[in-house]
């Protein structure tokens, strides 16, 4: 029997601590409360909602997960699966798939939903593209997703490093399809530089997540801009009409059905081909609280709505994540593996 939907809960948002935080040390991770305490917003007195029956993750048995983790550590590589505490990590790792996170483990942003560490990043590792390409070849991957932390400290936002990774993978694994999940390249001239650089070696799928509806950006994505993200997606598509574009949105942060539908319309109006829709899960008690658990029936309704808008592929469900079954999503959108 389907459980009734949890009611929306009130959210009290207060300004962050006005006292000057301690200076960031290069390469030192600020996680959990240390990270969120640096955010311009804090969340207080939010009741904890019990997870419904459809929010469950099966933990596979066997050594595949540990073997893949060992391979990643051996090559000094990082996955967003681990750094962002993705609930699907065991399923993906047990099938030998992973979403690689380049440009370090420290992000310059402080998004309230994200479990990736904040701080002052180290310079990019020049050996990372070769290590990544060797690992992809060793694993025999036919489809790989490469993402990164935000690098507001770099003039190109890390675009050249993305291109170096794409080129290295293609040199050693020419039949592997590559999806990149990029930051927003926000900043004066940064989007222009990033798009110019990415044109040198574009991916097979370009993914940038819108994350949430525009009204929630101040609380969820401080430092980001809704229209900027839409423009990035549209400009890439205009430059590369034959390359699939993709975005993702989380539910459960306080949005309404009407707001989600409006965001889907905005994405299609900006020439986005593929969309993922999934339930937000709070990574620690310090992060943005879960305001509501959307039901499987609502996810199905959004899938139908997205298909009617003309997306080439809609992945909508409680446990859907941007990179979850990315190869199947791409195949569904006509990207050959």
Swiss-Prot record:
Requisite cofactors: [4Fe-4S] cluster
Residues of the Radical SAM core domain: 93-312
Keywords, comma-separated and alphabetical: 4Fe-4S, Cytoplasm, Iron, Iron-sulfur, Metal-binding, S-adenosyl-L-methionine, Transferase
Similarity remark: Belongs to the radical SAM superfamily. Lipoyl synthase family.
Disulphide bonds in the chain: none
Residues the record lists as binding [4Fe-4S] cluster 1: 81, 86, 92, 323
Keyword Signal: no
Pfam family, any one: LIAS_N
Pathways per UniProt: Protein modification; protein lipoylation via endogenous pathway; protein N(6)-(lipoyl)lysine from octanoyl-[acyl-carrier-protein]: step 2/2
This enzyme's EC code(s): 2.8.1.8
InterPro entries found in the cross-reference section: Aldolase_TIM, Elp3/MiaA/NifB-like_rSAM, LIAS_N, Lipoyl_synth, rSAM
Cofactor note: Binds 2 [4Fe-4S] clusters per subunit. One cluster is coordinated with 3 cysteines and an exchangeable S-adenosyl-L-methionine.
Protein name: Lipoyl synthase
Compartments reported by the entry: Cytoplasm
Residues annotated as binding [4Fe-4S] cluster 2: 107, 111, 114
Organism per entry: Xanthomonas euvesicatoria pv. vesicatoria (strain 85-10) (Xanthomonas campestris pv. vesicatoria)
GO cellular component: cytoplasm
A molecular function (GO) term: 4 iron, 4 sulfur cluster binding
Cross-referenced Gene3D superfamilies: Aldolase class I
Catalytic activity: [[Fe-S] cluster scaffold protein carrying a second [4Fe-4S](2+) cluster] + N(6)-octanoyl-L-lysyl-[protein] + 2 oxidized [2Fe-2S]-[ferredoxin] + 2 S-adenosyl-L-methionine + 4 H(+) = [[Fe-S] cluster scaffold protein] + N(6)-[(R)-dihydrolipoyl]-L-lysyl-[protein] + 4 Fe(3+) + 2 hydrogen sulfide + 2 5'-deoxyadenosine + 2 L-methionine + 2 reduced [2Fe-2S]-[ferredoxin]
């Amino acid at each position: 029997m389907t459980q009734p939907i949890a009611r929306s809960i009130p959210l009290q948002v207060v300004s962050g601590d006005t006292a000057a935080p301690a200076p960031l040390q290069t390469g030192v991770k600020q996680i959990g409360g240390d990270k969120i305490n640096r955010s311009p917003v804090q969340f207080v007195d939010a009741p904890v909602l019990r997870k419904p029956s459809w929010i469950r993750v099966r933990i596979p048995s066997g050594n595949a997960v540990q073997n893949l983790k060992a391979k990643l550590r051996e090559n000094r590589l990082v996955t967003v699966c681990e750094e962002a505490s993705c609930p699907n990590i065991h399923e993906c790792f047990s099938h030998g798939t992973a979403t690689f996170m380049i440009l370090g483990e420290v992000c310059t942003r402080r998004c309230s939903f994200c479990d990736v560490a904040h701080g002052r990043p180290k310079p990019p590792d020049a050996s990372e593209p070769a290590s990544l390409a060797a690992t992809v070849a060793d694993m025999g991957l036919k489809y790989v997703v490469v993402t990164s932390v935000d690098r507001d400290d770099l003039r190109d936002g890390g675009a050249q490093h993305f291109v170096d990774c794409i080129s290295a993978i293609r040199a050693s694994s020419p039949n592997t399809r590559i999806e990149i999940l990029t930051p927003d390249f926000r900043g004066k001239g940064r989007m222009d530089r990033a798009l110019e650089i990415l044109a040198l070696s574009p991916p097979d799928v370009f993914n940038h997540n819108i994350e949430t509806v525009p009204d929630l950006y101040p609380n969820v994505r401080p430092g980001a801009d809704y229209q900027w993200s839409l423009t990035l997606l549209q400009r890439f598509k205009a430059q590369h009409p034959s390359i699939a574009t993709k975005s993702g949105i989380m539910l459960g942060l306080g949005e309404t059905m009407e707001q989600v539908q409006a965001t889907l319309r905005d994405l299609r109006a900006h020439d986005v081909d593929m969309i993922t829709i999934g339930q937000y899960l709070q990574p620690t008690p310090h992060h943005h609280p879960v305001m509501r658990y959307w039901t499987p029936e609502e996810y199905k309704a959004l899938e139908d709505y997205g298909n009617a808008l003309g997306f080439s592929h809609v992945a909508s469900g409680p446990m859907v994540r941007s990179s979850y079954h990315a190869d199947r999503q791409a195949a569904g959108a006509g990207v050959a593996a």
